[in-house]
């Protein structure tokens, strides 16, 4: 029986690396995978692949707010059997797309593995994360650590001087140096 999985964490926990490793494991056994990543991440660089911080890459389809995932996946699956769907940056999915993914699991019987952030720099849920927390069959937290050694489960956005940014757009692109993964204790200490 196929399931919808949501692998979530703070930044720098290796989500993309885990996604690419999972895809490789399927492919190594002669199974076909289909990878997606968010258009919002790709717009600036015009890329159509997933790249981990340690250098692993794979081509990927792009989704945006209008993408009908169930329809796209159904068409591709009819052409040639897909054994697993893997979605990077799944926190950018919307409610309808998460429901589409439940249909991929329940109707097409294809497992779907989603990887993304749970919350933003203000500790607010992303839309995709909210709906995946509600609809996923399995919730798996990937671990990363705070500078104090505790498990990091929050993200702080910082400016060039290392000061915490408390307001602004939920989505801001730049390098990983603009974000720091911290535990809840240090989130409260630094954010408030």
Curated annotation (Swiss-Prot):
Localization annotation: Cytoplasm
GO cellular component, one term: cytosol
Source domain of life: Bacteria
Major localisation: cytoplasm
Record-linked Gene3D superfamilies: 3.30.60.20, P-loop containing nucleotide triphosphate hydrolases
InterPro entries: P-loop_NTPase (IPR027417), Thymidine_kinase (IPR001267)
Top-level EC class: transferase
GO biological process, one term: thymidine metabolic process
The protein's Enzyme Commission number: 2.7.1.21
Molecular function, one GO term: zinc ion binding
Residues at the active site: 89
Annotated residues for binding of Zn(2+): 146, 148, 183, 186
Membrane-spanning ranges: none
Annotated keywords: ATP-binding, Cytoplasm, DNA synthesis, Kinase, Metal-binding, Nucleotide-binding, Transferase, Zinc
Reaction catalysed by this enzyme: thymidine + ATP = dTMP + ADP + H(+)
Binding site for ATP: 9-16, 88-91
Pfam families per the UniProt record, alphabetical: TK (PF00265)
Family, as annotated: Belongs to the thymidine kinase family.
Subunit structure: Homotetramer.
Name of this protein: Thymidine kinase
Lineage: Bacteria, Pseudomonadati, Pseudomonadota, Gammaproteobacteria, Enterobacterales
């Amino acid at each position: 029986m196929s399931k919808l999985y949501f692998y979530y964490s703070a930044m720098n926990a290796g989500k993309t690396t885990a996604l690419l490793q999972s895809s490789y494991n399927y492919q190594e056994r002669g199974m076909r995978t289909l990878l997606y990543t968010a258009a919002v991440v790709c717009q600036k660089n015009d890329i159509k692949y997933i790249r981990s911080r340690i250098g692993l890459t794979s081509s990927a389809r792009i989704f945006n707010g209008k993408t009908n995932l169930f329809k796209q996946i159904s068409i591709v699956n009819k052409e040639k059997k897909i054994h697993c769907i893997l979605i990077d940056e799944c926190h950018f999915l919307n409610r309808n797309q998460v429901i589409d993914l439940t249909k991929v699991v329940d109707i097409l019987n294809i497992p779907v593995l989603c990887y993304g952030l749970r919350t933003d720099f203000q500790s607010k849920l992303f839309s995709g994360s909210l709906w995946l927390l509600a609809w996923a069959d399995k919730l798996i937290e990937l671990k990363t650590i705070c500078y104090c050694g505790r498990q990091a489960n929050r993200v702080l956005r910082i400016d060039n001087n290392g000061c915490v940014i408390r307001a602004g757009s939920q989505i801001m692109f730049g390098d990983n140096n603009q974000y720091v993964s911290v535990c809840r204790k240090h989130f409260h200490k630094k954010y408030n």
